[in-house]
């Protein structure tokens, strides 16, 4: 296969070495577990967290005479994912046997797809950032292919002092292996790419992306070269199950390779693992080539064939994907690129926001969801599905601001009460006397008292009009934050004779 270099060197991405600049070349193989009640070739459950070897059929255990039967739902999920990646859907694909020995691979081979995968080339637009100015940079990452394959079981080395056990619950679970082109040039780009893939699949409902459960793993191929030069020898870092660790592993591995090359050495093509505790990669074994696996078509499975009508029917069912949703939020609600990017990054966040924003000021809703709700959730380590404040409650708080019942400051206090205690925001405002003061007579009295108590500040304010803000703050403090801020501001300026 000829690898085409589609990107020109970017000075921002280069790594300075002792003998000049270096460029990192990164390609990823992402293994995504298909959301399906049954495995790829058997009816065994795919439920996470079951007792060891509870979800194992005779097919999964490779008992003699047991034949695989394709799970059509897994095929549909692969096609949906391919469509979400704007990729070519191949109407004919073939399952192959990939031969290697692992104790947790009962068949002695893995059923995968080699020369004829179900999905061909596609593209993903990845937003890298934001930078210090809050700007994102969009890059296009090519998808080489997506193919279906079986997962292996799990070897357990911590259950007995002298023996290893094998759990076959994962054996035969359907995986989509999504292979990128070598279009990534930094750890940050790689992290953004995996994040985007996960977001797309969560929107599609084809993979839950729970890396802590092993539903999404990545093999990271890293090499370095002089800017614009020939591709270097790559090393593969296996089974990365954290987006943060992917970035750390790439940064370490690139510097390791640069140090070797600058000392006059050469890079060995090998498979490595990342030690998150030590923050370093280390060698596992020499890297296998395709011929080492002795691929051949699986004689127990016919080629997988379907027509364009089958693909079109699935395409009609696809939900709105993150890029389309982001464009719509920017166009229809006037959101900034930054705010829209944050809101569509997780489907659950986007769904929550759209419920809050329905029939309301989109920018105000975005501000509350991003800064107040997500900010508080991050502090306490909760996700939005478990938010103590529902979309209806947050929407009610926004309504109270817009109709002048409460000020922005009171709204912050009300949000904290709803977060901690629950309840209907409008009823809480009534029962706790939280309505803002709109009676101009009462506000004027408070303004007069503050001005009378601070004659020296009055003269300063007339010389320096920005001092009016100090008076506004004092009046708000005197009224317990209940005075209408705009009314206070107008009265202060009028009383001080400030334009």
UniProtKB/Swiss-Prot annotation:
Allows the formation of correctly charged Asn-tRNA(Asn) or Gln-tRNA(Gln) through the transamidation of misacylated Asp-tRNA(Asn) or Glu-tRNA(Gln) in organisms which lack either or both of asparaginyl-tRNA or glutaminyl-tRNA synthetases. The reaction takes place in the presence of glutamine and ATP through an activated phospho-Asp-tRNA(Asn) or phospho-Glu-tRNA(Gln). GO terms for biological process: glutaminyl-tRNAGln biosynthesis via transamidation; translation. The keyword Nucleotide-binding applies. Coiled coil: none annotated. Gene3D superfamilies: 1.10.10.410, GatB domain, N-terminal subdomain. This is Aspartyl/glutamyl-tRNA(Asn/Gln) amidotransferase subunit B. InterPro entries: Asn/Gln-tRNA_amidoTrfase_suB/E, Asn/Gln-tRNA_Trfase_suB/E_cat, Asn/Gln_amidotransferase, Asn/Gln_tRNA_amidoTrase-B-like, GatB, GatB_C_1, GatB_Yqey_C_2, Gln-tRNA_amidoTrfase_suB_CS. It comes from Mesorhizobium japonicum (strain LMG 29417 / CECT 9101 / MAFF 303099) (Mesorhizobium loti (strain MAFF 303099)). It catalyses: L-glutamyl-tRNA(Gln) + L-glutamine + ATP + H2O = L-glutaminyl-tRNA(Gln) + L-glutamate + ADP + phosphate + H(+); L-aspartyl-tRNA(Asn) + L-glutamine + ATP + H2O = L-asparaginyl-tRNA(Asn) + L-glutamate + ADP + phosphate + 2 H(+). Pfam families: GatB_N, GatB_Yqey. The lineage of its organism: Bacteria, Pseudomonadati, Pseudomonadota, Alphaproteobacteria, Hyphomicrobiales.
């Amino acid at each position: 296969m000829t690898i085409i270099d589609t990107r020109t060197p970017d000075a921002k991405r280069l790594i300075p070495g002792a003998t000049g600049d270096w460029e990192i070349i990164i390609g990823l193989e992402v293994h995504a577990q298909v959301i399906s009640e049954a495995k790829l070739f058997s009816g065994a459950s795919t439920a996470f967290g079951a007792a060891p070897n509870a979800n194992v059929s005779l097919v999964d255990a490779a008992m003699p005479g047991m034949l695989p039967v394709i799970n059509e739902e897994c095929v549909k999920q692969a096609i949906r994912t391919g469509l979400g990646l704007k990729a070519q859907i191949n109407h004919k694909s073939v399952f192959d046997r990939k031969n290697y020995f692992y104790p947790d691979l009962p068949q002695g081979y893995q059923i995968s797809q080699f020369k004829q995968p179900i999905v061909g080339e596609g593209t993903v637009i990845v937003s890298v950032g934001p930078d210090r100015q809050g700007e994102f940079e969009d890059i296009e990452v090519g998808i080489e292919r997506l193919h279906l394959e079986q997962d292996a079981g799990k070897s357990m080395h911590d259950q007995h002092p002298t023996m290893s056990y094998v759990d076959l619950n994962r054996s035969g679970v359907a995986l989509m292996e999504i292979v990128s082109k070598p279009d990534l040039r930094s750890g940050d780009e790689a992290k953004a790419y995996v994040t985007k893939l996960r977001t797309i699949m969560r929107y599609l409902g084809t993979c839950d992306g729970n890396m802590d459960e092993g539903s999404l793993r990545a093999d990271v191929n890293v090499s370095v070269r002089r800017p614009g030069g020939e591709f270097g020898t790559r090393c593969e870092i296996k089974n990365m199950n954290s987006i943060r660790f992917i970035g750390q592993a790439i940064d370490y591995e690139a510097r390791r390779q640069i140090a070797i090359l600058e000392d006059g050495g050469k890079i060995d093509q090998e498979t490595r693992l990342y030690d998150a505790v030590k923050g370093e990669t280390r060698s596992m074994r020499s890297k296998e080539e395709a011929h080492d696996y002795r691929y051949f078509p699986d004689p127990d499975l016919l080629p997988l064939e379907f027509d364009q009508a089958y693909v079109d029917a699935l395409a009609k069912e696809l939900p709105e994907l993150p890029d389309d949703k982001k464009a719509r939020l920017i166009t229809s609600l006037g959101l900034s690129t930054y705010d829209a990017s944050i809101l569509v990054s997780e489907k659950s966040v986007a769904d929550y926001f759209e419920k809050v924003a329905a029939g309301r000021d989109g920018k105000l809703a975005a501000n509350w969801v991003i800064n107040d709700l997500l900010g508080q959730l991050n502090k306490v380590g909760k996700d939005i599905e478990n938010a103590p404040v529902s979309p209806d409650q947050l929407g009610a708080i926004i309504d109270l601001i817009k109709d002048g019942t409460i000020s922005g400051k009171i709204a912050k206090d009300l949000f904290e009460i709803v977060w901690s205690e629950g309840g209907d925001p409008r009823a809480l405002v009534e029962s706790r006397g939280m309505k803002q003061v709109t009676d101009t007579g009462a506000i004027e009295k408070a303004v007069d008292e503050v001005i009378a108590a601070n004659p020296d500040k009055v003269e300063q304010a007339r010389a320096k009009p920005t001092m009016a803000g100090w008076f506004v703050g004092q009046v708000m403090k005197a009224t317990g934050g209940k005075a209408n801020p705009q009314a206070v501001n107008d009265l202060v300026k009028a009383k001080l004779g400030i334009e």
